[in-house]
Amino acid sequence: MKILGIDTSSMAASVAVIEDNKLICEYTINTKKTHSQKLMPMIENMLGLSDLNVREIDAIAVCEGPGSFTGLRIGMATAKAIAHVNDIPVIGVNSLEALAANMNLCDKKIFSILDAQRNQVYTGRYQYEGTKLVEIKEIGIQQIDELLEELAHSGEQWILVGEAVYKYEDKIREISNIEIPAASNNVTKAGSLCSVAKVKFDEGKDIFDCYTVNPLYIRKSQAEEQYEEKQRKLQEQK
């Protein structure tokens, strides 16, 4: 079974193909180019270098969020289009679980964090039970200072993974029971995304078609929140 993975949930764009449990190719770019500029050329180049035709792909694994609202929409639209044309399923994987999968078979508890702005982070907690990655607590959103205080007093060893690590690195390094992994593990890799998707497919979980898969938004976008605040103030003035 060949799975094409697509992740555009952050500044980095990543695509990959796995066949069963073997990584065939992975292509990650972290530049200022927009995802709309680079995503399709990345997919086409990767498939070409791998001597693969898109018709050989059996399923699409797409990062459903949380993450950049614009990035998620671009990745999701691309996944839907490829799935529609080739009549193949789409497997949704959240970005926090895919990040945790970068720490394959880690013996510590894994805390995935992504920047949610306003000193907040999207959070996901995971651990490996044997070879299986297990969610400890549902994904959510939390103030970074509250989160770090909670982990500092947890009495457990944690690995903190994700792009938000860099934003709050000075604070994180002050806490002795938190470890920061190598830089390459702090971006969502499409290869890890595909590995999580393969497990989900085998278990019959989170499998959609091109019409039913949608981004996972933990909260409303800033534009939506500003609009609602404006409407609330207008109502109060009446």
Positions of PLM-derived features:
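Short glycine-aspartate micro-motif
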Residues: I3-G5, A61, G71, I110-I113
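N-terminal beta-alpha supersecondary unit
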Residues: M1-E64
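Phosphate-handling active-site elements
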Residues: S50-R55, H84-S95, K205-D206
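Short beta-strand scaffold segments in enzyme catalytic cores
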Residues: A12-I18, V121-R125, L216
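DPxDG-like acidic metal-binding loop motif
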Residues: A59-V90
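Acyltransferase
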Residues: P181-K238
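Surface "functional belts" at beta-alpha junctions
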Residues: K22, T34, P89-V187
